[in-house]
Amino acid sequence: MGEKLILIDGHSILNRAFYGVPDLTNAEGIHTNAMYGFLNILFKFLDEEKPDYITVAFDLSAPTFRHKAFDGYKGTRKPMQPELKQQVPLMKELLKAMNITVVEQEGYEADDILGTIAKESAAKGIDVSIVSGDRDLLQLADEHIKIRIPKTKKGVTEVEDYYPSDVFNLYGVTPHEFIDVKALMGDTSDNIPGAPGVGPKTASAIIQKYHSLDNVFEHLCELKPPKAKTSITENIEQIKMSRFLSEIKINVPIDYKVEDSKAGDFFNENSYELFKKYNFKNMLKKFENTDIIAKDPECYEYFKKISDFAEVENVFNKAMDIAGGIEKIGLSIVRESELTAVGITLSDTEIYYIPVSGFVTESYLADRLSDVVSVASNRNIASANIKDYLDIFEKDKINGYPLVSEKAFIDTAIAAYLLHPSNESYDYESLGREFLSLTYPSKTELLGKLSIKKAVNEAEDNLIKYVCLSSYAYYKCADKITEQLKNENMYELFETIEMPLIFVLFEMQQQGISVDKQALVDYSKVLGTKISVLEKEIYEAAGEEFNINSPKQLGVILFEKLGMPNGKKTKSGYSTAADVLEKLAPDYPVVSKILEYRQLSKLKSTYADGLTQYISEDGRIHGTFNQTITATGRISSTEPNLQNIPIRMEMGKAIRKVFVPKNGFVFLDADYSQIELRILAHMSGDEKLIEAYNSSADIHRATAAQVFGVPLDEVTDEQRRNAKAVNFGIIYGMSSFGLSQDLSISRKEAKEYIERYFASYPTIKTFIDGLVSDAKEKGYSLTMYNRRREIPEIKSSNFMQRSFGERVAMNAPIQGTAADIIKLAMINVYNALKEHNLRSRLILQVHDELLVETAEDEVETVKQIMLDGMKNAVSLKVPLEVDLKEGKDWLEAH
């Protein structure tokens, strides 16, 4: 078999990848989707072809001989998107780092370079594959030159291959004749005029018959069809120019030797650094069999399973000695239904896997882990997702609270989240890549779909790697993460908010919230009855029964049978999304019923029926509170999501009635009043807004007076309602369109409201504009506590993406600060309840609201604790107000 050369049309493949891969950015906000897609295509062809040589050709921005010959050449092309343009030099740099030859030549296009290299190489007996999305290159096909055109559909890349026979089968002409076909038909993408009115089929038919333009010109009188005859006859010089522009040159004067473009050594230290920089996580695995990172054989060498009791004792004793000082240990805990094994890293050469076995029982491991934790107070224990394992260290308690210092731990997952809150994962594999420049096999790669219990018996070697790698990664990256947090001024956020919060959330999960099962059943029945009534009313209005939950069937009923306006039909049918139906609802009662039917059906399936599966044997729901999910810093809840309970509709509110305190207790519910507006007043420094809050004015009435220019006592309810919508809309970067939808007014009126608002509060306008400009400059926003949110969209050339980024830039500092403040309040309340040795417990947080299950004889004390803890969480230029209520169920307390 002869030698092989792959030639790649750089701009063509990069452009194709840019539009075929969703927008991606790295931590610095650099767009990377085109590079990522390019590399995927590159690796596909490298795997298939296994070439001896590889070269990539790029166009230069300088004019070529074609531009000089024809001023209009490519004159209709739109400018390259900035996000793509940014990636062109980066792609070249990356290719060079991979030791792939990159060729450019002033005055010529990449096609000419590819043609020249291909023909010269083929003449030497080298088999050439040209990879491009440009069919112009079909003219280069011969027995030794294959044109490969990749096409990506639904994420799957398929390749069309063309030798001369394939070109003939498609167009009925030879590759050389294909130039003449293009000269006749022209090319709108390159602004090559051709013969006006002559399309691909006619051009192909003419060249099939006459085989060359010269022969066509000699037989003008007999050309068919008549329109083509006229056009060609009248545009001979233009057609000749089009042929000149269409023909790829194969004699470009370039300094190139195919022998210097050998394929190999793609995965080296230089390319690794760039792959890591651009966050090409999946591709980093390609470096595993190199000397650059492999799988860190040095640490693998020191992985050791120990089950001898005396040896285990020695490891724990040494761990206590280290944890009691200032050095760190790495700790990974493996547990599904029960504790299975522990990974402990004491140093670079002491990495242990300790399974539950023989005398090393589950309770023994828990006791010894508690011993280690009890002596640590300098964030000596590096681990991840500590909240999931705190119950293991509960050997000693006071009033139900574990005697574990939060300063014992550094949670590497939470620390990494603060640095990059938009990342998908913060596991050991991600930490290794991000902070250690190491690529580790993932848990899935090591264990597949095996449970831990099965892995103990069926894949213990890989289980040992998984457990040891985890503890080793936590141990190795802890100091580096700490250093980065300090460099980014986020360590205080980590130290004073996120780490203490772990213990608060753990206690909330342990406590759970009690559910009145009978009330839940009754609620489900009420919903079921209402849904049945609505169902009948909808069928009656429609004149037939149909599946209301089927968008396709519903669309036909609404827009065809009932003839409602503005129905937009797609391939799958009419859109029946909520925003479409909400516009129809005021004029069509049946649509209002459909919207209500949907809302009640969701309430029934998600809450009335769905909550039952989460009720534990103790009659309580023990949900999970997450610290590393939202980009804004807000806590999220899952299994179930109690933060998403709808409260705008009465039946949605009613679900809160099923949540009840235990006997002898009541609920105290405290909710911050307008916290985000108060934060806006503080951060913007707007004197009018600050004065309004400091004088305890009705802020929405005060805003209405300012915006509408009326005395405070003459503000109407409608003006107040509109001002309220503007107040909150400003925080969320609401546009005039959004406000018009919210208030059911015209966009013009909404625009006037916003303009009046900013005219009344110019400092707020300046502040918000500053947030946007800062985010554009830095690529991220910051809260008062230096919580960072990356906003790559804000630099997008796409209007919709850029507008989204600007709205995020306006809102994230305010919403993120509110999230930080409620977290501080939670810590305050938790600590005060603990210090007062009370039986009352903080059990739930929903956005700006805290719920405490309060012993009846502790109500007054807890009320004061909640008010103090929330009001004094932070000192602002305006007071923080808290609405506090008491109730025998959550609805009554809210």
Where do the PLM segments sit?
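Non-catalytic, usually N-terminal nucleic-acid engagement modules in DNA/RNA processing proteins
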Residues: 1-59, 65-70
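Extended two-metal-dependent nuclease catalytic cores across DNA- and RNA-processing enzymes
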Residues: 2, 22-26, 75-254
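Active-site-proximal helix-loop-helix substrate-binding element of RNase H-like nuclease domains
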Residues: 154-182, 303, 343-487, 497, ...
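Conserved "right-hand" nucleotidyltransferase catalytic core of DNA-directed polymerases
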Residues: 231, 235-359, 450-647, 666, ...
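Function-dense linear segments that define catalytic or interfacial modules
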Residues: 344-348, 419-422, 426-449, 466-473, ...
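Conserved catalytic core of nucleic-acid polymerases
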Residues: 453-456, 510, 566, 622-623, ...
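Active-site palm subdomain of RNA-directed nucleic acid polymerases
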Residues: 485-497, 501, 821, 825-846, ...
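C-terminal polymerase-core module
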Residues: 529-536, 540-592, 759-807, 811, ...
